[in-house]
Curated annotation (Swiss-Prot):
Protein name listed in UniProt: Photosystem I reaction center subunit XII
Organism per entry: Synechococcus sp. (strain CC9902)
Key words, A-Z: Membrane, Photosynthesis, Photosystem I, Thylakoid, Transmembrane, Transmembrane helix
GO terms, biological process: photosynthesis
Subcellular location: Cellular thylakoid membrane
InterPro entries associated with the record: PSI_PsaM (IPR010010), PSI_PsaM_sf (IPR037279)
Domain of life: Bacteria
Length: 34
């Protein structure tokens, strides 16, 4: 099963997506509490 993108790129994309999701959650929580 070979894909166009390699495994390290998938891992980096997951880390970036998780970081963005955490930042969005923290922002929404701070806006909700304000």
């Amino acid at each position: 099963m070979d894909s166009a993108i390699s495994s390290p790129e998938i891992f980096i994309a997951l880390v970036v997506a998780a970081h963005a999701a955490i930042l969005a959650l923290r922002l929404s929580v701070s806006l909700y509490r304000a």
